[in-house]
Amino acid sequence: MKRVGILTSGGDCQGLNAAIRGVAKGLYTEFGKDVEIYGIRDGYKGLIFGEYKLMKPEDFSGILTLGGTLLGTSRQPFKTIRVIDENSVDKVKNMKDNYKKMKLDCLVILGGNGTQKTANLLREEGLNVIHLPKTIDNDIWGTDVTFGFHSAVEIATNVIDCIHTTATSHGRVFIVEVMGHKVGWLTLSAGIAGGADVILLPEIPYDIDKVAKCLNDRIKAGKKFSILAVAEGAISKEEAALTKKERKKARENFPTPPSCTASPRSWPARWTTRSASACPATSSGAAAPAPTTGCCAPAWGPPPPGSSKRRNSASWWAWWAASASPSPWVTWPASSRACP
């Protein structure tokens, strides 16, 4: 009698139930009644606390196209897997003990790169482990495509594609944030398929000046809208030179961009140049000074009541940012990130 355990760990995605069904069908086809499959609940959590049940063939029926995972899932960070918690639970020891308690010949684990690290740890502890690469990020070493990736690309592509109509109708710049903390496969694939005008990836630090130039070039070419596909882990060239802690601190200190209803079609009239020495004249006729090279003051209207009259004051530049651009994050030059 062969005994096989199966669990899913980490975030859910399309294809989990299909993969579970495939494993079960393959085992039943190969061994028939001489195999027992144990479904382990909620990922590694179930293996740690002994939450599992003996599955039957009918349990795997009708789940081929069902989203999520019938086994449940949870996140168990690899960096804490060997840490004894406040309840004196030795997670690694418990997993080994429950593996032996079920008398498993093999443990099949479905998950991403964090799950893979823990699976490898269990292998090093003497357990027979098979890891099936599941992640929408497509960042598992040793495989071309992970299951869950293609479905995520399709969904992200549809979002980018559908937003074109609104962007065109209102003449706006849209930023579509796509999942991908350290890798940009999903953003790249969806951006290309969905027709994004700018794609920013974690692997390639971006130059905000080039991004702004690209958007302005589209405006000059008569394009009323632009769509940016941005991976959640995308960073600028300036941020890339910082440590992780420095980057986090810099982002915490960076001002939140104010909201605005200005459209890109008004940019050329409002922001004719990005040179500090060639800013358009203010209402008083004098060129407004910029706090740093690359910033440019607007040429219309006085600051709102209550704000400082000094054009190098924080309140004045906050007003300028709100008036000049619907997205200061995009249009502010990299050299001007110190703008208050």
Enumerate the language-model features and the residues they cover.
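Short, acidic/small-residue loops that bind anionic groups at enzyme active sites
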Residues: 30-32, 36, 122-146, 200-207
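A cross-family phosphate/adenosyl-ligand binding-site feature
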Residues: 1-8, 19-105, 114, 236-241, ...
